[in-house]
């Protein structure tokens, strides 16, 4: 008798073409995977009842479609004792209300859940602002406890604006970049962005031969003393509100 046809083994993480979002990450069955804006540290804060709606994705034996880099994936030990696969530091989840492969019903849910894509240039985080001074800050830079949404790079590193800058004008960086280690310019090529953000709000400027990304006319920077993913210490340095985060509420640069 003829030998049975070998079954094609599907990779544990696949790259799917989605009509709305372009390239997205799915599991081996084509179920869409998601990022959670609140997972700014190397852990998951989706616990308890949250997991009923957003079940975790974990691949014990990771196999990837072409175009995905194994170095971008890792496994975390969750506080509930289970394991979860991460991509560029973001834990991966399913959305329980996605019924069939290709569904993306969870995107922009409460403005904190986004379809996982390999080509995001930026991400949208939501976390407590904790300044360089160790104090908790709210979005208006008064002291207090509460979550603020803000733009990060694809790995979750916080981006800032400088209140002394004007539209498409970096007033901070020295021509020889001697102070660039304090507030490094964000040199990011814009590809895909989370659906809450508008492509038209982004641009770029030339800064002494290098290219800096802008948002609503504001040049974007990193803070050199943010040493870990999820840090947002720049909000209080040298004083609260001099280097704010950027989010959809940010006003246009003057």
For the regions a language model picked out, list residue spans one by one.
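Compact beta-sheet-dominated domain cores in extracellular/mature segments
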Residues: 2-254
